[in-house]
């Protein structure tokens, strides 16, 4: 049994949470909806999570959102995923900045549309001095590729 002081110690130790945003398309398909609707619902859930974390002591949140392997999906689906990133940065940046969130996007930018790369750079630049939650978005990312690039 954990006593009250032990629970507080555990809470203090959590400083980084990483989430793999997977299964949204399957969730939508299982409900007879287009896969995109699942991804859009995932964005709604992410917004709620970020608002819930606003006053938390969490230091880092890493979101694995789009793997390099996701390029194997149909072009229509990858285009809609790009639209979601575009929408997230465009619509949510002001609120995130006002909540002192620092944004960093990791992953290869070479295949990402230029306008999205510009949005990413702008978000990172605007929030670089923020000292609250560090939101790291792994987009067009591969851990394996990162290891290969490091060697």
For every predicted segment, state its role.
Residues 1-151:
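Flexible, compositionally biased loop and terminal segments
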């Amino acid at each position: 049994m954990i006593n009250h002081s032990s629970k507080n110690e555990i809470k203090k130790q959590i400083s980084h949470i990483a989430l793999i945003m997977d299964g949204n398309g399957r969730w939508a398909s299982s409900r007879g909806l287009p896969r995109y609707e699942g991804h859009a619902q995932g964005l709604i859930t992410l917004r709620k999570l970020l608002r819930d974390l606003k006053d938390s002591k969490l230091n880092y949140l890493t979101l694995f959102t789009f793997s390099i392997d996701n390029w194997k999906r149909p072009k229509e689906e990858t285009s809609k995923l790009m639209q979601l990133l575009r929408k997230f940065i465009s619509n949510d940046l002001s609120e995130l900045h006002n909540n002192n969130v620092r944004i960093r996007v990791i992953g290869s930018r070479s295949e990402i549309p230029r306008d999205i790369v510009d949005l990413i750079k702008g978000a990172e630049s605007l929030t670089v001095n923020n000292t609250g939650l560090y939101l790291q978005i792994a987009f067009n990312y591969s851990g394996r590729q990162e290891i290969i690039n490091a060697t």
